[in-house]
């Protein structure tokens, strides 16, 4: 939805406040340092509980999320106090396991509900860890979190593997093998390659020859897509829809995609439509009817396109998700299924049932609420700003300081009163649930052979967070979102696939603001020191004969060359951390 904003305000919000200068860079740097420290805090907790066995009582996923969010808020209290109007959590801590691609951040009072809703699932379910709330050996765990200071945002996602260990031997006996290893390796290599490619925009003369455009030396969206797709193909993986490499600006970090049409959107996104385009480009069948669906209601600058150049002084979010195709015996579509908590319908045995834990405020909607609890809750939500939030963040006992059971029980008590008010708020679209999404594989022959009477006229009202111009998943075939959802439930060939994900935030600093006095890429989050890749072994490798792969190898060499290569700097986590003792764990 387009908001009525004057040209003067638009100039201030989108241009003036995003000029990279010392004050802005310091806010980015501080938020990145807090995010890096929070990521290390969560990974250390998981290692202490599941690998080193230092904590006697295991911590559940909901407990880890609450503790990480509390850690971020406690850290933010130490910086820019009384100096900025807004600071806080930009992305609630999400711990997605295996096939859950994004959005898994359950509240502490939902642990038993999730078990009850999924009582027909067993240990063989791909969602067993998410349902029980505890991680298991072999799980591919994606940790996502972020914070902001005055709207300048840093986000991170890191994939780690849970290895089998015991008290006598805390080191894993071997690396992760198989299709999951392919996805983990591909996500790490792609993230590092795109980071190096963005760094080449600062010194275009260092851009590898095989990656150069015919007319210009600048880094474009087409090059970014080519590099990522080449790595995915080499590791027999698919880029999961929702992956993106996009520019972020003050208060515009991708959290409101689909709610507000962002002017001058700049980034590469991967959707089902790109898989459809590849299918039609490689097919020899001539009797497939394709449509020309164009959304004329949305400004063209708000629709993502690869036709852009990366410029100095911009901030980019690199968010890439991969799933392996080893178990897929024929061509198919990788799509995302939104999880819901409707218990009145018939569910398949291994279908996940859960309710969203995070919400986004839609300021374009207005409604006079009837319930007093809903009005009071909306007042608290409006103070939170434009970023996603959880109900636990609104509790008077949040953030937790000692991580005790008493603090957790106090948060649970507040949640009970909040849920009634949130029902009226969401029913009137004042807030939108952040969806929990699961990666699914659907065979193409099932899609092409299906009847589609309504074509693209059907509309999925539940798909609230959809990018402008991508409301129809398969526009050429005329397959709408609601039709694709029905196709996933109408065949037993549909498969659930594990997902690996890496996300980092980078700044392209010019010589006027860089520490070294020359252009450099400043990596706010991620990196080899804080987000060290897990021990995996993939049987696949990049093909050196491919010109794009040669460019990827050149990017890796430039990243390692400290003298003549690319100038890149990483934000380091804070040295002081919170150590969780076994006697201070929350018992729920």
From Swiss-Prot:
Q: Which InterPro entries match?
A: Creatinase/aminopeptidase-like, PA2G4/ARX1, WH-like_DNA-bd_sf
Keyword tRNA processing appears in the UniProt entry: no
Which Gene3D superfamilies does the record associate with it? Creatinase/methionine aminopeptidase superfamily, Winged helix-like DNA-binding domain superfamily/Winged helix DNA-binding domain
Name the UniProt record assigns to this protein: Probable metalloprotease ARX1
Q: Does the keyword Protease apply?
A: yes
* Functional note: Probable metalloprotease involved in proper assembly of pre-ribosomal particles during the biogenesis of the 60S ribosomal subunit. Accompanies the pre-60S particles to the cytoplasm.
Enzyme kind, highest EC tier: hydrolase
Q: Where in the cell is it found?
A: Cytoplasm; Nucleus
Catalytic activity, EC: 3.-.-.-
Q: Where are the transmembrane segments?
A: none
Q: What GO cellular-component annotations does this UniProt entry give?
A: cytoplasm; nucleolus; nucleoplasm; preribosome, large subunit precursor
Q: What's the subunit arrangement here?
A: Component of the nucleoplasmic and cytoplasmic pre-60S ribosomal particles.
Its Gene Ontology biological processes?
proteolysis; ribosomal large subunit export from nucleus
Q: Name the family.
A: Belongs to the peptidase M24 family.
Q: Which GO terms describe its molecular function?
A: metal ion binding; metallopeptidase activity
């Amino acid at each position: 939805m387009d908001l009525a904003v004057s040209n003067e305000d638009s100039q201030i919000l989108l241009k003036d406040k995003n000029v990279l200068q010392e004050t802005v860079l310091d806010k980015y740097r501080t938020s990145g340092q807090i995010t890096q420290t929070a990521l290390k805090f969560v990974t250390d907790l998981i290692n202490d509980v599941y690998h080193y066995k230092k904590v006697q009582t295991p911590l559940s996923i909901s407990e880890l999320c609450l503790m990480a969010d509390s850690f971020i808020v406690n850290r933010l209290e130490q910086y820019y106090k009384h100096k900025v109007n807004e600071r806080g959590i930009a992305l609630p801590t999400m711990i997605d396991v295996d096939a859950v691609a994004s959005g898994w951040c359950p509240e502490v009072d939902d642990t038993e509900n999730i078990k009850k809703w999924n009582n027909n699932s067993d240990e063989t379910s791909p969602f067993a860890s998410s349902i029980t709330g505890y991680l298991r050996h072999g799980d591919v765990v994606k940790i996502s979190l972020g914070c902001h200071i005055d709207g300048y945002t840093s986000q991170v996602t890191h994939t780690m593997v849970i290895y089998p260990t015991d008290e006598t031997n805390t080191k894993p006996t071997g690396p992760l093998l198989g299709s999951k290893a392919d996805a983990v390796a591909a996500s790490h290599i792609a993230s590092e390659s795109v980071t190096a490619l963005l760094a080449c925009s600062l010194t275009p003369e260092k851009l590898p020859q095989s990656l150069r455009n015919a007319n210009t030396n600048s880094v474009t969206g087409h090059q970014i897509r080519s590099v990522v797709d080449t790595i995915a193909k080499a590791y027999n993986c698919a880029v999961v829809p929702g992956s993106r490499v996009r520019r972020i600006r003050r208060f515009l970090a991708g959290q409101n995609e689909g709610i507000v049409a962002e002017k001058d959107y700049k980034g590469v996104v991967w959707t089902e439509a790109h898989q459809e385009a590849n299918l039609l480009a490689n097919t020899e069948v001539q009797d497939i009817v394709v449509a020309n669906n164009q959304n004329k209601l949305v400004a063209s600058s708000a629709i993502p396109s690869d036709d852009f150049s990366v410029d100095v002084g911009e901030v980019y979010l690199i968010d890439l998700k991969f799933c392996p195709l080893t178990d897929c015996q024929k061509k198919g579509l990788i799509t995302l299924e939104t999880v819901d908590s409707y218990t009145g319908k018939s569910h398949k045995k291994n279908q996940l049932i859960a309710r969203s834990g995070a919400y986004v405020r839609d300021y374009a909607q207005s409604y006079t609420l009837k319930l007093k609890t809903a009005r009071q809750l909306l007042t608290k939500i409006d103070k939170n700003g434009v970023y996603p939030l959880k109900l636990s963040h609104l509790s008077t006992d949040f953030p937790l300081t000692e991580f005790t059971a008493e603090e957790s029980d106090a948060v649970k008590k507040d949640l009970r009163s909040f849920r009634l008010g949130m029902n009226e708020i969401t029913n009137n679209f004042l807030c939108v649930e952040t969806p929990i999404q699961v990666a699914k594989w659907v065979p193409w022959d099932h899609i092409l052979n299906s009847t589609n009477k309504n074509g693209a006229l059907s509309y999925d009202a539940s798909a609230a967070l959809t990018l402008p111009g991508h409301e129809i998943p398969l526009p050429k075939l005329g397959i709408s979102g609601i039709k694709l959802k029905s196709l996933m439930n109408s065949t037993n060939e549909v498969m659930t696939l594990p997902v690996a994900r890496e996300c980092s935030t980078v700044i392209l600093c010019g010589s006027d603001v860089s520490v070294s006095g020359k252009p450099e890429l400043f990596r706010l989050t991620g990196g080899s020191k804080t987000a060290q890749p897990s021990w995996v072994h993939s049987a696949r490798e990049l093909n050196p004969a491919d010109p794009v792969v040669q460019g990827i190898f050149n990017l890796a060499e430039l990243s390692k060359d400290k003298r003549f290569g690319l100038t890149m700097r990483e934000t380091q986590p804070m040295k002081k951390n919170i150590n969780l003792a076994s006697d201070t764990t929350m018992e729920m």
